[in-house]
Amino acid sequence: MARIAGVDLPKKKRIEYGLTYIYGIGLFTSRKILDKVGISYNKRVHELSEDEAAAIRKEIQENYMVEGDLRKQVAMDIKALMDLGSFRGLRHRKGLPVRGQKTKTNARTRKGKRKTVGAKS
């Protein structure tokens, strides 16, 4: 099993899809990396030689922000929005949808379980 950027890639998958298991790498980026390194998309992860795996590791390490670093950067960006007091930051702080969705009836994922208000018995 190839280990790239701290992630064990599934052995039987094609390398172009295997790389998408790394946080921050989608299909487009995966193909871009493989083109640059010169590896066929159809090659399976378990068929990679150690040199090819090292080349992929080097390409990702030098040119892409992935896994922990990317997660940390995203968290810092959200924290900066909250500290600024911007509208988006306030929505993050309140746990509401940030991108303009309506909240009267939907938004259950962000708002959580329903809280009944004013139920009289």
From Swiss-Prot:
GO molecular function, one term: structural constituent of ribosome
Presence of the UniProt keyword Ribonucleoprotein in the record: yes
Pfam families the record matches: Ribosomal_S13
GO biological process: translation
Family annotation (InterPro entries): Rbsml_uS13_C (IPR027437), Ribosomal_uS13 (IPR001892), Ribosomal_uS13-like_H2TH (IPR010979), Ribosomal_uS13_bac-type (IPR019980), Ribosomal_uS13_CS (IPR018269)
Superkingdom to which the source organism belongs: Bacteria
Keyword line: Ribonucleoprotein, Ribosomal protein, RNA-binding, rRNA-binding, tRNA-binding
Any GO CC annotation of this UniProt entry: small ribosomal subunit
UniProt cross-references to SUPFAM superfamilies, sorted A to Z: S13-like H2TH domain
Chain spans, region Disordered: 95-121
Membrane spanning stretches: none
Self-association and partners: Part of the 30S ribosomal subunit. Forms a loose heterodimer with protein S19. Forms two bridges to the 50S subunit in the 70S ribosome.
Family: Belongs to the universal ribosomal protein uS13 family.
Record's function text: Located at the top of the head of the 30S subunit, it contacts several helices of the 16S rRNA. In the 70S ribosome it contacts the 23S rRNA (bridge B1a) and protein L5 of the 50S subunit (bridge B1b), connecting the 2 subunits; these bridges are implicated in subunit movement. Contacts the tRNAs in the A and P-sites.
Protein name (Swiss-Prot/TrEMBL): Small ribosomal subunit protein uS13
Species the sequence originates in: Campylobacter jejuni subsp. jejuni serotype O:23/36 (strain 81-176)
